[in-house]
Amino acid sequence: MKKKVLAIALVTAFTGMGVAQAADVTAQAVATWSATAKKDTTSKLVVTPLGSLAFQYAEGIKGFNSQKGLFDVAIEGDTTATAFKLTSRLITNTLTQLDTSGSTLSVGVDYNGAAVEKTGDTVMIDTANNIMGGNLSALANGYNASGRTTAQDGFTFSIISGTTNGTTAVTDYSTLPEGIWSGDVSVQFDATWTS
């Protein structure tokens, strides 16, 4: 009888040790959304981004994902207009790492296969040259009607270059420092009504 009690006590002691040695592992992440609110229904041209951009590094491809960034365009019609042109131009596209490394990433912007550059305008609509704007064609059809016309389309955004410290370019994104980059990607839209 004493042997059974001793054996049960030993088994209980060993079982208790196994439980005591196991440690809980937890991880936590915080998601942050920047938020603003704006309403403008009177300007001649209003462009509203529909969402935000978040690039994630993928180890398997040693690169960052690309994203479709949708936007809404609203214009006020001009009944005296005989032609309409809408262009876009890249203004800012640098993301900077939020530490002391100075590492940067450059975001490329593409519209229907054409790069949107800082050095020139990308034509989105030009009714005089029969460029009707694809998904923005409602604007090409409504620019000379009374009232407002809206349409939605999107850019493709991707990371096109990076630096480890603000000056030293990288060809292999796996060599970038760990961390988070932040910044703005701004595109200027210009609309011209010709009378």
Swiss-Prot record:
Induction: Positively regulated by EcpR.
Alphabetical list of Gene3D superfamilies matching this protein: Fimbrial protein EcpA
Record family assignment: Belongs to the EcpA/MatB fimbrillin family.
Subcellular location: Fimbrium
Its job: Part of the ecpRABCDE operon, which encodes the E.coli common pilus (ECP). ECP plays a dual role in early-stage biofilm development and host cell recognition. Major subunit of the fimbria.
Lineage: Bacteria, Pseudomonadati, Pseudomonadota, Gammaproteobacteria, Enterobacterales
Domain of life of the native organism: Bacteria
Signal peptide residue numbers: 1-22
CC per GO annotation: pilus
Pfam families hit by this protein: MatB
Organism: Klebsiella pneumoniae subsp. pneumoniae (strain ATCC 700721 / MGH 78578)
Subunit structure: Self-associates. Forms filaments. Interacts with EcpD.
Keywords for this protein: Fimbrium, Signal
Full protein name: Common pilus major fimbrillin subunit EcpA
